[in-house]
Design a protein with these regions (language model features):
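N-terminal accessory segments that target, anchor, or regulate ATP-driven/P-loop NTPase machines
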Residues: 1-156, 339-342, 350, 361-365, ...
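Conserved catalytic network of the ASCE P-loop NTPase/AAA+ motor domain
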Residues: 16, 59-62, 87-91, 184-188, ...
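The start of beta-strands in P-loop NTPase/AAA+ ATPase cores
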Residues: 23, 263-264, 331
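Short gly/ser/thr-rich secondary-structure transition/capping motifs
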Residues: 48-52, 245-250, 287-292
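Conserved AAA+/SF3 P-loop NTPase catalytic/coupling segment centered on the Walker-B
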Residues: 77, 229-236, 253-287, 303-306, ...
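Flexible nucleotide-interacting loop at or near the entrance of a catalytic core
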Residues: 125-198, 396
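Nucleotide-binding/hydrolysis machinery
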Residues: 156-176, 180-183, 187, 206, ...
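Conserved post-Walker A coupling segment in P-loop NTPases
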Residues: 167, 177-242, 246-248, 259-264, ...
Length: 435
């Protein structure tokens, strides 16, 4: 199944046995007998003596509601994840918390992609820390059960058949709530929504998820930044279509509204919905009908319309005619900024390093980041969100690998990439959404 949405039935969830620990910790043998590790973890649990530390194995038996994989090599994670998956398939909301150190990032990325491609990445949380102490400090925040999948799988080109697929990873609880909200919209007849989020935050992925949950029709996208929004005839033809002979030499054209019938028409960069664009949309938004260019009969709108903008709501309100703007009548869906989503940031770093490393033939691919390198990423504001982080990682990867810089990308390379692609001060930062 593509995308999120496989929820665990809480009614069907069997109560854990009285002897089951609250948290099972799977760790390398070296840490298994360490009493200090047990004591550190135990202090984060709701009751004492609720931590069981075991060595990972294919025969691992899961009975606890939470399982922590502590610095296990990502290439050995499958038996643990499979055991958790079997537990979930039996009706339990068991959650797997994968804790790695920064040197294991590329290996984690390969594991995440493999699980996502096999549709077996579900109910998982992520922690990145160099030491057990660092893991323990984040553990309490991860002890919340996950009832969603961790990936939206979507075509690289959603409107082209037989295209490759890509994975949009969803680990942050805020994104899980956004997915649940979208699912509620589609289940209850809401056919108009406005996605707000900074550039590169994942708006297109969630618009596509809206279509996945609607489960009918086509997904059709219109990017107003790529269109001649000052030409009313061109915009009317694009959205409403035109009939044969509408202008000299014209053949008939199916507009975006008709092409998306029963599905979703995604209007991106919709801060451009002003002037001629709004004139075309006004009747469609007010009355649910439109007139193809050159036609004599109106057509009903039979698709959901999802708008998206990287502008803040305040900027949108101040830049448009409010009477026109309110005609859009859309419920608001906010995509949180990446700097608030550490687990998603870990997934982006891991999968990007894995992807870049797979292409290397004469270079030695870095395996991960130094502690200082991860700190630089974690402390960056990321106004450009996922897109900017990927550009920074690509620059740092090339600088490190081409110079034979070793197994880890250092902070200097990360800072250089940030200076190139994510400057701390830029005039555009003031107009972007800050969800």
């Amino acid at each position: 199944m593509l995308g999120l949405g496989k929820k665990v039935s809480r009614e069907a969830e069997a109560a854990p046995s009285a002897s089951a620990a609250f948290l099972q910790v799977v760790t390398p043998t070296l840490l298994q007998a360490d009493a200090d590790v047990r004591a550190l973890i135990d202090r984060q649990l709701p009751a004492p003596n609720q931590c069981q530390i075991v060595a990972g194995s294919a025969a691992l038996r899961i009975e606890s509601p939470f399982v922590l994989s502590l610095f296990v090599d990502p290439s050995s994670l499958d038996p643990i994840a499979d055991a958790v998956l079997r537990r979930r398939q039996a009706g339990h909301a068991t959650t797997l918390i994968v804790a790695i150190n920064p040197t294991q990032l590329a290996a984690l990325g390969r594991w995440l992609e493999a699980r996502a491609n096999a549709s077996t990445l579900v109910g998982t949380r992520l922690i990145l820390a160099p030491t057990v102490d660092g893991v323990v400090r984040q553990l309490a925040d991860r002890l919340a059960q996950v009832t969603e999948d961790n990936v939206i799988r979507m075509p690289v080109s959603p409107e082209i058949e037989n295209t490759d697929y890509k994975n949009f990873f969803v680990f942050n609880p805020q994104l899980h709530r956004l997915a649940a909200r979208i699912r509620g919209f589609t289940q209850n007849g809401i056919s108009r929504a406005y996605l707000l989020g900074g550039p590169g935050s994942g708006k297109t992925s969630f618009a596509f998820y809206f279509w996945l949950m609607r489960n009918k029709g086509r997904f059709v996208s219109v990017n107003l930044a790529a269109e001649s929004t000052g030409d009313k005839a061109a915009i009317k033809s694009l959205l409403c279509g035109h009939v044969s002979g509408a202008f000299p030499g014209a053949g008939a054209r199916t507009g975006a509204f008709l092409h998306a019938r029963d599905g979703v028409c995604f209007i991106d960069e919709s801060h451009g919905v002003t002037g001629p664009v709004m004139e075309v949309l006004m009747e469609a938004l007010d009355n649910g009908q439109y007139l193809p260019f050159g036609a004599s009969a109106k057509q009903p709108i039979q698709c959901a319309i999802v708008f998206a903008s990287n502008r803040s709501w305040e900027h949108l309100q101040s830049a448009v005619n409010l009477d026109e703007f309110t005609r859009m009548g859309a419920a608001i869906l906010e995509v949180p900024e990446l700097h608030k989503r550490e687990e998603d940031m870990i997934a982006v770093v891991a999968t990007t390093l894995a992807r870049l490393g797979q292409r290397c033939s004469t270079w030695t691919a870095p395996l991960g980041l130094s502690e200082a390198g991860w700190k630089a990423i974690r402390e960056c504001r990321w106004h450009g969100n996922v897109r900017a982080l990927v550009r920074v990682l690509e620059a740092a990867f090339v600088d490190t690998a081409s110079a034979g810089g070793g197994e880890l990308i250092q902070a200097d390379e990360i800072e250089h990439g940030i200076a190139l692609w994510e400057p701390k001060a830029h005039h555009s930062h003031q107009i972007y959404a800050a969800a």
